[in-house]
């Protein structure tokens, strides 16, 4: 903002205390002639401005230089004619008009507000002409604070314009922050070692000999070059079909189901499905069961005459796993294994009861004494499961069997073997796998016989 920007430029401007800032710090400060006139001569009359103007240069030359800078009153334009604005007039007539305006106290407002220096007492003179800075923190205020340290303490505040040292400090701090932004843009290590991509880039061989630059006409334009192995191609299609030798596919294979993953986190979450929750086993299961004699196992054939196929690791055609005992379907192989363990526990329990009843036939009731074999033999007094047709020795075993294995499900028995399934697709898959020849014969028998022509 230029100097004197907010000064009102009317004809009857009130006198304002003003201190002009100089550019050179060590140079002497020009003195205000109005203050010298107020100190050395009586109050001038408004009718003699010419005598004041004539006495102005002699008074400035003969007056002694005070210790502290005199206070400048009035409009600064009336004292200094060489201001920074290029449009300001600098003629003597202009100075004369401003001196007349500044010394003319004919107005009652200005006469009451600012009396002449001759009418002031010594105390009023010290109070009125005390050194006051209107601009805090400038170079003049610093010099006046050192010169008049006995009157008032120096006011130290931040400068309005930053110094050269502060500017240099800002530039150096900005230049020091630039390497941090450059360091954030380095993502090469993350790309080459990221496990989520499933790829790994091997380190390239160090070529001590530079590649010879072929100056022939068959040299490609350099647009289709593999950035890893530096092989050049004539068209983008060849570059797209190129399999770089530095790119290696990383595979993480599940040891239980041989499923392949490209990320180790996915493999870890997949392996949690293979670990079923450990349920609280009953007290009877905690006790070690007695081994079933091999003679009884040989005497008791399987409940199915046809051999059952083993469990397929990949599951069925629609991605489900079927239980060969009851025909239930499961989405995961771990669920099927857990379900089969329940079958085995129940079968071991029934075999144990049969073994104990065979050892002590006198303790058994008469109805159970006639049917020592609960699973494979089918005497008239054995209880048959209505869902799967399994033979059970007593009612308690039948109720336990129904509670554990059957939840009011519809049974689909096989026509060729005693196996029973609880879904029509399960029975169809069983017939296609275990009885393909019998199924073909049935189809042929159901076809109508054509008469020969």
Swiss-Prot record:
Keywords: Developmental protein, Differentiation, DNA-binding, Metal-binding, Neurogenesis, Nucleus, Repeat, Transcription, Transcription regulation, Zinc, Zinc-finger
Zinc fingers (C2H2-type) by residue: 252-274, 321-343, 383-406, 412-435
InterPro entries cross-referenced by the UniProt entry: INSM1/2, Znf_C2H2_sf, Znf_C2H2_type
Name of the protein this chain belongs to: Insulinoma-associated protein 1b
Native source species: Danio rerio
Localization annotation: Nucleus
GO biological process, one term: regulation of cell cycle process
Residue span of region SNAG domain: 1-20
Transcription regulation recorded as keyword: yes
PROSITE patterns: ZINC_FINGER_C2H2_1 (PS00028), ZINC_FINGER_C2H2_2 (PS50157)
């Amino acid at each position: 903002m230029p100097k004197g920007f907010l000064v009102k430029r009317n004809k009857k401007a009130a006198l304002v205390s003003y201190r002009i800032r100089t550019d050179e710090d060590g140079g002497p400060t020009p003195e205000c002639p109005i203050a010298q006139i107020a100190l050395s001569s009586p109050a001038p009359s408004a009718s003699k401005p010419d005598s004041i103007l004539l006495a102005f240069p002699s008074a400035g030359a003969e007056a002694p230089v005070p210790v502290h800078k005199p206070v400048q009153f009035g409009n600064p334009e009336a004292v200094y004619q060489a201001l920074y604005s290029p449009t300001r007039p600098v003629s003597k007539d202009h100075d004369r008009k401003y001196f007349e305006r500044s010394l003319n106290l004919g107005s009652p407002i200005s006469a009451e507000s600012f009396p002449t220096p001759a009418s002031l007492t010594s105390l009023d003179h010290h109070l009125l002409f005390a050194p006051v800075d209107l601009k805090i923190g400038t170079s003049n205020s610093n010099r006046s604070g050192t010169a008049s340290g006995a009157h008032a303490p120096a006011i130290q505040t931040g400068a309005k314009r930053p110094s050269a040292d502060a500017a240099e400090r800002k530039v150096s701090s900005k230049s020091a922050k630039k390497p941090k932004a450059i360091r954030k843009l380095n993502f090469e290590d993350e790309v080459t070692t990221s496990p989520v991509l499933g790829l790994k880039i091997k380190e390239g061989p160090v070529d001590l000999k530079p590649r010879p630059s072929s100056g022939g006409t068959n040299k490609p334009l350099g647009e289709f070059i593999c950035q890893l192995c530096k092989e050049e191609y004539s068209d983008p299609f060849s570059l797209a079909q190129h399999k770089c030798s530095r790119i290696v596919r990383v595979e993480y294979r599940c040891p239980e189901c041989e499923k392949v993953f490209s990320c180790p986190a996915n493999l870890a979450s997949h392996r949690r499905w293979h670990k079923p929750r450990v349920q609280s086993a009953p007290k009877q299961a905690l006790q070690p069961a007695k081994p079933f004699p091999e003679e009884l196992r040989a005497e008791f054939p399987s409940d199915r005459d046809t051999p059952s196929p083993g469990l397929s690791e990949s599951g069925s055609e629609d991605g489900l796993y079927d239980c060969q005992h009851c025909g239930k379907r499961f989405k995961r192989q771990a669920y099927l294994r857990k379900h089969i363990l329940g079958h085995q526990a129940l079968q071991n329990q029934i075999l144990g009861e049969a073994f104990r009843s065979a050892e002590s036939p006198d303790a058994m009731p008469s109805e159970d004494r006639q049917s020592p074999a609960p699973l494979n033999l089918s005497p008239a007094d054995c209880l048959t499961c209505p869902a799967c047709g399994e033979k059970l020795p007593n009612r308690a075993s039948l109720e336990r069997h129904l509670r554990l294995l059957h939840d009011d499900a519809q049974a689909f028995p096989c026509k060729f073997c005693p196996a029973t399934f609880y879904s029509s697709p399960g029975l169809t898959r069983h017939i296609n796998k275990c009885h393909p020849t019998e199924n073909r014969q049935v189809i042929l028998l159901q076809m109508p016989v054509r008469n020969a022509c």
